[in-house]
Amino acid sequence: MAQYSRIQVIKQMEESGMVPLFYHGDSSISKQILKACYDGGARIMEFTNRGDFALEVFTDLIKYAIAELPGMIVGVGSITDAKAASQYMLAGANFVVTPVFREDIARICNRRKLMWSAGCSSLTEIATAEEFGCELVKLFPGDVLGPGFVKSIKGPHPWTSVMPTGGVSLEYDNLKLWFDSGVTCVGMGSKLISEDIIANKNYNLLKETVEKTLKTIKSLKQKK
């Protein structure tokens, strides 16, 4: 069962401005990644459902976060059907992120009052997801749509909260483009939690990178 309400999850996304996301098939390494991000100031994390036994690793992460990382909100991404969403909910997921909009996922998450974010790539998809209660839409693929898309939809849809995933990098200019366009937060994957960092187990570098990126985002949000 989720430890955090959908309101608490949304609030954390809005306040931090960044949702780190990753997948790794080893529980021990995944815990160290989560801890490094936590030590860097992150209080929300998306574990992507992209490999064999991902649910087992996720379950270990949730238990670890509850026991050792107070205030860390862990959710799941890359969910493509209601059955998978239900399995992760039972494992303690605090939110669900999908690459596409699906009514079955929306219904099961709403039934349990769990925060969910649907992957959308058009204003029609965004409007439909919001009709089903989606508070924050995942803009995907962000590298294809770009900040200009966000700025354009904010005209007719100023109430829409957006989290782009893909196409978001650590560079100041890139982050500035996204936040100037009106995003609520950004999803940050391999640009933040790189293969090199994982391979070399350079968790201190990950901590420092998370800390620096959060500070950059905070400064950009304050200037708006």
Predicted regions and their residues:
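Glycine/Thr-rich beta-alpha phosphate-binding loop at enzyme active sites
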Residues: 43-51, 84, 89-91, 112, ...
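Catalytic cores of alpha/beta
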Residues: 81-91, 124-132, 169-186
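Hydrophobic faces of well-ordered beta-strands that scaffold small-molecule active sites
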Residues: 18-22, 45-47, 74-77, 96-97, ...
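Conserved N-terminal beta1-alpha1 strand-loop-helix module at the mouth
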Residues: 1-74, 79-83, 87-91, 200-222
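Generic hydrophobic/aromatic pocket-lining and core-packing "Φ" positions
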Residues: 34, 58, 85, 106, ...
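Glycine-enriched alpha-helix->loop->beta-strand junction motifs that scaffold or abut catalytic
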Residues: 41-43, 68, 89-96, 110-117, ...
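Generic structural signal for hydrophobic
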Residues: 36-37, 61, 88, 109, ...
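Glycine-rich phosphate-binding active-site loops on the catalytic face of alpha/beta enzymes
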Residues: 43, 95-105, 139-146, 182-203
